[in-house]
Amino acid sequence: MEVKRFVCNMIRENTYVVSDDTRDAVIIDCGAFYDMEKAAIKQYIDDNQLVPKHLIATHGHVDHHLGDRFVFDTWGLKPEVAGGDEDLMERLPEQAKEICGEQLTADDFAPVGRYLTPADTIDFGHSRLTLIDAPGHSPGGTAFYSEADKVLFTGDTLFRGSIGRTDLEGAQAP
């Protein structure tokens, strides 16, 4: 499994492109807002001849969805989002103003493809990501785990050296 991280948008959110030896790929938490961020992700995917199969999100805060429309327009993928964050997803334009100071509309975001449950898996190429419920930062917070590669994508549930933020909409402190 190959993992490439991109630091995106005004919040400095982590976007990941994950691929395997088949060149199938998954884009996780696409926060690409600026043109240079979108160009870097597209160039990486093109240069490595990757084929994005899924756009998945660990939760429904706007900084993890600012690039969803770019992915939808470029590769036709709709975001697959943790169930429990439906209200957050419906409020993306409002979140953009509150959290990022940006005036965006619903048309600036891709339509949700489906809401995920813990029973779902994300399969691409020879790889599989399983879902782990990780509420706290948001009601539907989800981590994606590759057992074969021992890799865990936590979104904002965990930060280096600490737990994730619990002061945003929908969060619950432990």
Name the predicted role of every residue range:
Residues 1-4, 76, 166, 173-174:
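Accessory terminal helices/loops
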Residues 32-34, 95, 121-174:
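Metallo-beta-lactamase
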Residues 1-48, 143-155:
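Conserved beta-strand hairpin/beta-sheet module of binuclear metal-dependent hydrolase folds
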Residues 18, 29, 59, 71, ...:
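Divalent metal-coordination and catalytic microenvironments
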Residues 10, 22, 107-108, 159-161:
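Short glycine-enriched loop/turn motifs at secondary-structure junctions
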Residues 6-7, 111-114, 133-135:
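Short Gly/Pro-enriched turn/cap motifs at secondary-structure boundaries
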Residues 33-124:
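Active-site HxH/HxHxD metal-binding segment of metal-dependent hydrolases
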